[in-house]
């Protein structure tokens, strides 16, 4: 089974179990070293604690055992974790919540010969992101069509 199919099955199975105050941020499955790892990234307002991840792991693990036929080709480790400071912005809803925050955006196609922008997300209307970024020593604004975004994540401003 393809990795993307496994991720879709797992996401569909566990989403109902991850309820408020928690938010499912992402699901990843792949090899880390010699082992397969299923990573479930969750968050909540104010941040996620070690106890939260332990509780969610106990809730999610039995659900994964009910997926038939078993989508996992090999044994795997389950990791329930925080998305971290540089959490991915994989949906339009996640981008909307990031308005006012410092973000990193990679594009499929360059705008003014630039494919990577890092700056403050000023607004997002579902179609375009408007960002303020530094070009050497000058502040500039750029309008980025959402469909040209390859990857976006929160960023730490140094």
Swiss-Prot record:
Q: Which SUPFAM superfamilies match?
A: YhbC-like, C-terminal domain, YhbC-like, N-terminal domain
A cellular component annotation (GO) from this entry: cytosol
Keywords of the record: Cytoplasm, Ribosome biogenesis
Task: Report if keyword Glycosyltransferase is assigned.
Answer: no
Does the keyword field hold Cytoplasm?
yes
Do you know which Pfam families this protein is assigned to?
DUF150_C (PF17384), RimP_N (PF02576)
Q: What is its main location?
A: cytoplasm
Q: Which InterPro entries match?
A: Ribosome_maturation_RimP, RimP_C, RimP_C_sf, RimP_N, RimP_N_sf
The source's superkingdom equals Bacteria
Q: Which residues form the signal peptide?
A: none
Where in the cell is the protein located?
A: Cytoplasm
Provide the GO biological process annotations: ribosomal small subunit assembly; translation
Alphabetized HAMAP family for the sequence: RimP
Which family does the UniProt entry place this protein in?
A: Belongs to the RimP family.
Q: What NCBIfam families would the database entry show?
A: PRK00092.1-2
Q: What does this protein do?
A: Required for maturation of 30S ribosomal subunits.
Q: What is this protein called?
A: Ribosome maturation factor RimP
- Species of provenance: Streptococcus suis (strain 98HAH33)
Gene name for this UniProt entry:
rimP
